[in-house]
């Protein structure tokens, strides 16, 4: 099916939120059961709960959409949504969502593959990041703006890769006052069954990421790999990464056992900010041709923390730091008035 320069409008209400989130009920355009759909230009508008703009559901389903304007007004209404193993290819879209739980680039149970090139993606509701990933999502040359939420959320064994994107997140407060952190990018495991349990992956190459409130990265109840190269970071509160457990009040694992285990790789990356790791979490930091200005485990309460600096990397301390192991040349650490402790021993 091919649609060119069409206007699609969806009104009404939803009888079942999960059917809308998982299977596309109430979407303006739903492709399923192996359908092949191409949408070019035109406008998609919804004013219904679960009024996702364009929805790809099921293995073998492919949606190609380009140059389309998408507007959604109510909750649980993403701009483009992919679930159940579907595929979405989007280029140069103009997407804006207003409701809560309405990511501009949205996925849910069963995931799939999403490729986005160019375009603008804006969200205005709470719990509405520009990208919510329970899928494999790659985005290049796009502007991603979350005005009342994190910029990106990765749940479970899924990934987000950004190339030359401009991202900003402005989480105004904790959801219903029951969240424990404010951040720009969250990587976690919810235990809801919407995402497979396993290592999450986030990668950013080039572009700019701005946190207008809270930490840059927050990792809890999961393991993940974060790769950063040539990104310009603008920090809100001075914390680059917070890998910690949570109270489990929202079902995110068992308290005391739900930390964040992070492997972070910096390649040709300059960044300023602290790294916080609690006693049930861990960090493996690998720096190549990079500069980090900040403290790691300044309060000496973290779990296993290893740091590797290659000969072309520099670590500028902003406080006393405590790590389990260090691999590199001590001369590449600018300590100033501070000290680095490795396994309890002061080395600089």
Task: Give residue spans per PLM region.
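Extracellular beta-strand/loop-rich repeat segments of large surface/secreted proteins
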Residues: 276-348
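Beta-strand-rich solenoid/repeat architectures in extracellular/passenger domains
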Residues: 2-24, 36-50, 61, 66-76, ...
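Hydrophobic residues embedded in beta-strands of well-ordered beta-sheets
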Residues: 88, 137, 159-160
């Amino acid at each position: 099916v091919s649609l060119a320069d069409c206007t699609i409008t969806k009104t009404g209400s939803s009888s079942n939120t999960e059917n809308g989130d998982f299977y596309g009920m109430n979407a303006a355009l739903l492709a399923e059961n192996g359908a092949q759909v191409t949408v070019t230009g035109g406008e998609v508008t919804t004013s219904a709960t679960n009024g996702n703009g364009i929805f790809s559901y099921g293995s073998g389903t492919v949606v190609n959409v380009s140059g389309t304007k998408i507007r959604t007004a109510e909750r649980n209404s993403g701009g483009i949504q992919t679930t159940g193993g579907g595929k979405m290819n989007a280029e140069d879209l103009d997407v804006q969502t207003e409701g809560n739980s309405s990511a501009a680039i949205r996925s849910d149970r069963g995931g799939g593959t999403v490729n986005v090139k160019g375009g603008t993606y804006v969200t205005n509701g709470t719990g509405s990041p520009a990208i919510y990933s329970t899928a494999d999502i790659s985005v290049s040359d796009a502007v991603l703006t979350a005005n009342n939420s994190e910029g990106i959320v990765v749940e479970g064994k899924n990934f987000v890769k950004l190339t030359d994107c401009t991202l900003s997140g402005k989480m105004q407060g904790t959801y219903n006052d029951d969240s424990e952190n404010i951040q720009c990018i969250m990587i976690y495991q919810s235990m809801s069954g919407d995402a497979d349990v396993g290592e999450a992956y986030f990668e950013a190459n080039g572009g700019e990421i701005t946190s207008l409130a809270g930490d840059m990265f927050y990792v809890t109840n999961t393991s993940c790999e974060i790769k950063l190269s040539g990104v310009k970071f603008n920090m809100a509160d001075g914390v680059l990464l917070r890998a910690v457990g949570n109270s489990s009040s929202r079902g995110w694992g068992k308290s005391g056992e739900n930390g964040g285990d992070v492997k972070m790789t910096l390649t040709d990356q300059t960044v300023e900010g602290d790294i916080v790791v609690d006693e049930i979490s861990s960090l493996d930091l690998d720096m190549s041709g990079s500069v980090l200005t900040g403290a790691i485990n300044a309060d000496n309460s973290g779990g296993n923390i290893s740091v590797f600096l290659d000969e072309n990397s520099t670590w500028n301390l902003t406080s006393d730091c405590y790590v389990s192991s260090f691999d590199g040349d001590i001369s590449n650490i600018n300590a100033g008035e501070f000290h680095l402790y490795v396994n309890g021993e002061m080395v600089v």
